[in-house]
Amino acid sequence: ENDLRQIGVFVSGMDSWKYSPMAHKVIVEKPPSLDLLLKVPGVLWVEPVLTTYARNLAASAFMSDGDIATQDHWEFGLNGGGVVLGVADSGIDIDHSCFRNSSESIGDVGINHRKVLVNNVSLDDGDNPGEMDYRHGTHVAGSLVCHDVYNYLNDEKPQNGTTMAYGANLVFQDIVSADGWIPPENVTDLLIEHSLARGVIHSNSWGDDTTAYTDRTADFDMWAVEYPWSLSFIAPGNTGGQLLEPSNGRNVVAIGASTKAANPELWQSSSVGPTELGTYGIFALAPGVSISSAKADGIDDSMNNALRASSGTSMATPIAASY
């Protein structure tokens, strides 16, 4: 702390920090000298604070066997039953038919809800009009776990939407408010909450507009080392050869977007890599063009059923995570 003060950087309370295998993080105003800051004992790296963005611009059937008319995996009981999938995004329209408990009721979120185990609204309270990337979160959540309530009540397999894992449950974490995307400083906060709900696979269709290996990337990598049974799927962006953070981690799954067809091709805007370090970029491709999924309407109790189409690695990533 004294070393930092000597170069004009003031951080209080460092003596009360508890031990953690994860690096402690401090946000400060730009110091007089980055070179001096990097020479302070214990400083691992310095990076700019950037702005986070979303990555979006009959997929499950193509993922199964390439035939739009069949869902062979469902016939073998491979529908995500008993699996908890997590996603952090722009909010969820929880009264949508993909998620609500009955035709006329949302139900109480928790272990007795048919879809949503956790809906973390500590930052914001839903997928709201006027907020950045309105409808993005509801769409990706539908791609993860949608089972239309009317099909569910009639004990039918899904007939709309795009998810393979219609039997899965969801942990949703709203990280967008009227101020934009505000993911926690430590993404492990999201991963811990997901893990406590028995979640293993976590889907993230967002990140900062940089190809650098960031503090957030390191968090995802460290989490996978400490908890090797968990896996994070991350959208790499829609920038062609560039691979945006945190999909450039070594222990995450970066998913590129393909066309939605029996003989798919790489979508021309999909990020592919390699990383700045020259390592492989995307791990796999999943359908990411004109993906139909849940459409938010911004009304808390409309009991809406509408779908909408969207494209991008944002759409491909939850489809791969539900595979």
Please provide the spans of the model-predicted regions:
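Autoinhibitory propeptides
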Residues: 3-84
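Sec-exported extracytoplasmic/periplasmic mature domains
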Residues: 9, 39-42, 92, 145-149, ...
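Extracytoplasmic/secreted envelope proteins and their assembly/folding machinery
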Residues: 31-34, 40, 137, 141, ...
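A cross-family glycoside hydrolase active-site/sugar-binding cleft signature
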Residues: 49, 173-174, 203-207, 233-237, ...
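Catalytic-core environment of secreted peptidases
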Residues: 123, 259-318
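Short acidic, glycine-rich surface-loop motifs adjacent to enzyme active sites
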Residues: 170, 191-217, 234-236
